[in-house]
């Protein structure tokens, strides 16, 4: 027995949704507009934020570079965020399907969910890997920045 999710094969030229826990929730300050994925999904279950490659590796999309088409297949099993170039997607390796999982739980419509102990051990509870800037302002420096302090009082979270 295995938990399964809809199968989503990586295909070049597809715009993938990036992972966001609040698809379908009201946009801040609105009572009529909801957070919608690039695919039009209004629920995380329907969003195309993960892919299965022909290497039988599963990746989660952390950033789709502003909604451009994915043209480079994510590869590798590193615990670091994988950036594909030139499309600019950022992916997180999640797990690989074993031969037994492929035989028993991989169909044209569904695929097994598995836990990779190496990935799980390398994760940090509460880590923030990607930050989306809503309004950038001016005077900043473009690029990747590390060691940014996150300050907040815990209010406004959707899932305490």
Predicted region positions:
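Extended assembly-interface regions of large multimeric machines
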Residues: 1-69, 74-112
């Amino acid at each position: 027995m295995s938990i399964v999710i809809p199968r989503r094969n990586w295909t070049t030229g597809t715009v993938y949704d990036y992972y966001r826990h609040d698809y379908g929730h009201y946009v801040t300050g609105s009572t009529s507009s909801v957070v919608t994925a690039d695919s039009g999904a209004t629920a995380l279950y329907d969003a195309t934020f993960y892919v299965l490659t022909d290497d039988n590796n599963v990746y989660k999309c952390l950033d789709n570079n502003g909604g451009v088409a994915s043209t480079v297949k994510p590869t590798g099993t590193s615990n670091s965020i994988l950036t594909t170039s030139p499309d600019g997607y950022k992916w997180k390796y999640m797990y690989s399907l074993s031969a037994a999982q492929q035989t028993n739980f991989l169909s044209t419509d569904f695929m097994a969910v598995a836990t990779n102990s190496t990935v799980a051990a390398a994760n940090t509870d509460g880590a923030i890997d990607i930050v989306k800037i809503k309004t950038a302002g001016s005077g900043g420096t473009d690029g990747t920045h590390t060691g940014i302090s996150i300050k907040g009082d815990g209010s406004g979270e959707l899932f305490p």
